[in-house]
Design a protein with these regions (language model features):
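Conserved glycine-bearing catalytic or ligand-binding loops at nucleotide- and phosphate-handling centers
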Residues: 253, 268-274
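Core catalytic lobe of class I
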Residues: 1-259, 264-265
Length: 274
C-alpha cells in the first residue's frame, strides 16, 4: 500500500511495507537525512507488533542489513539519527561504528523527559532516550539550534593573547561585559516532554523533538527518510518545514492514522527515487 502527496514541488512518499523493501528501491546517495525511532528490543508483544527480543544476535540480524542500506542511500553530506533507549544502544553503536566508521560518530544525544520514578525500584531510574548521531562524511550539514535563556547571562568580554584569555577594557580601564541571551543546544535535551497517549504508540515522539533534529541536519527542499515511521509524525514535520519525505511502517494502522492527520492528497512517485 502506498499513498503519496505532492504540493508545489514538495512530496511525501509514505509506504506500508518492510523497510528493507523500500530502501531497495532508493538510489545510492539520495537521502539527505535519516531519522528513525527504532525498535527498542524489549521482547514485549504489543497490540500491533512484536518487539525484538533483547539478544545481541537477534538485534544484529535485524539491524545490520538495514543500517548498511541506510548508509548506501545517504548522501555524502547526510546524517543519520537512530533513537532508542539504554537496552540496545551499545549494540547499535557498535553496528554504526562498523558500517559508518568510528570517526563518523558525531555525538550521543540524551533526551530526558522527566517521567516520575518508581518508588520501589532498586536501581537508578532511567527517564531518557539515547539518540545516536553519525554522519556519512565530515562535511555533513549542520545548522546550530539555539536555546533562549530565561535570564540573560552576564559574560566578560575577553581576547586571546598567546592562548590566554585576557579581559577587554575600554579607554577608562573598565572591563567590558556583554549579555548572552541564547546558547547552542548541547547533547542533553531536557526541555521537550514525552508525548503520552500517542496516535498509535503510547510513546510516540513529540513533534518538537523531530523538528529540532530536522532543522539541525537538513535544509528546505531536502529529502528526509524515516523507516520506522509509526503514525508518520516525521512526515508531518517535514510537511511543516518544507522538506520532502520518504518512509514506511509495517503496521497498516500507521497509514490509516496518517491519512486521518490530513497528510495526503496526491502525487506521482518522484523520479529521483527510482
Amino acid at each position: 500500500m502506498t499513498v503519496k502527496e505532492k504540493k508545489g514541488g514538495q512530496f511525501l512518499d509514505i509506504r506500508c511495507c518492510d523497510n528493507l523493501e523500500l530502501m531497495a528501491e532508493i538510489k545510492d546517495n539520495t537521502v539527505d537525512l535519516i531519522y528513525c525511532d527504532i525498535l527498542y528490543g524489549t521482547g514485549r508483544k504489543f497490540a500491533d507488533y512484536q518487539d525484538l527480543k533483547p539478544k545481541r544476535g537477534i538485534i544484529e540480524e535485524h539491524y545490520i542489513p538495514r543500517i548498511k542500506e541506510m548508509h548506501r542511500i545517504l548522501k555524502d553530506t547526510g546524517s543519520i539519527y537512530l533513537q532508542m533507549d539504554t537496552k540496545i544502544n551499545h549494540w547499535i553503536r557498535c553496528i554504526l561504528d562498523d558500517v559508518f566508521g568510528y570517526d563518523k560518530f558525531q555525538c550521543e544525544i540524551i533526551w530526558t523527559y522527566g517521567i516520575g520514578l518508581k518508588a520501589k525500584s532498586k536501581k537508578f531510574h532511567t527517564h531518557n532516550d539515547n539518540i545516536l548521531l553519525y554522519s556519512k562524511n565530515n562535511n555533513h550539514v549542520y545548522n546550530p539550534q539555539m536555546k533562549k535563556l530565561e535570564k540573560p547571562s552576564k559574560r566578560w568580554v575577553t581576547k586571546m593573547i598567546k592562548g590566554v584569555n585576557t579581559p577587554v577594557r575600554d579607554n577608562n580601564g573598565k572591563q567590558e561585559t556583554y549579555y548572552v541571551t541564547e546558547v547552542k543546544y548541547g547533547n542533553v535535551w531536557d526541555d521537550i516532554p514525552m508525548r503520552r497517549n500517542g496516535i498509535i504508540y503510547k510513546t510516540e515522539k513529540p513533534k518538537k523533538l523531530i523538528e529540532r533534529i530536522i532543522k539541525a541536519s537538513s535544509n528546505e527542499g531536502d529529502l528526509v527518510a524515516d523507516f520506522y515511521a509509526g503514525s508518520f509524525t516525521t512526515a508531518e514535520v517535514c510537511k511543516d518545514l518544507n522538506r520532502n519525505f520518504i518512509g514506511c511502517d509495517i503496521n497498516p494502522n500507521g497509514i490509516a492514522k496518517a491519512k486521518e492527520r490530513g497528510l495526503f492528497s496526491f502525487t506521482d512517485k518522484p523520479d529521483k527515487l527510482d
